[in-house]
């Protein structure tokens, strides 16, 4: 990662994803906005993991709000599964909504192009490009 040592974590994306910082709002509002923006690009939410609640329940650790949304675009997922049946090991696309240490609300998107590089299937690579374009539009709609 090319992050300067003093750069806030919420401002530099990892190589396996990309993100945006939301305008000020409460966490529940952010989840609604993210879900609606994903829906506008054809994604539904298959799973929602409340990491904050899980860490509290399992480890007794208090942490900031943090949700992992398992987003899926069924037609694109079907194409990928048809091209490579075991690609389900890399699905769905995770989208993280979290509160950063500086109080920013950050939305992180798994980069399907980076993740799907594990396969050498050109059809899967093309689908990953399409998924990334949709997720980038979601990011633009949220910023």
Regions found by a protein language model. Name each.
Residues 35, 52-53, 136:
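Short glycine-/small-residue-rich flexible loop motifs, especially phosphate/cofactor-binding loops
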Residues 44-96:
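Compact, glycine-rich, soluble single-domain proteins
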Residues 40, 57-58, 141:
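Residues at alpha-helix termini
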Residues 14-16, 65, 91, 103:
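A generic structural signal for well-ordered coil/turn residues at beta-strand boundaries
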Residues 2-41:
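Terminal, regulation- and interaction-focused segments at domain boundaries
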Residues 96-120:
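Beta-strand/loop substructures that line and gate deep hydrophobic ligand-binding cavities in soluble
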Residues 117-143:
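Well-ordered alpha/beta subsegment
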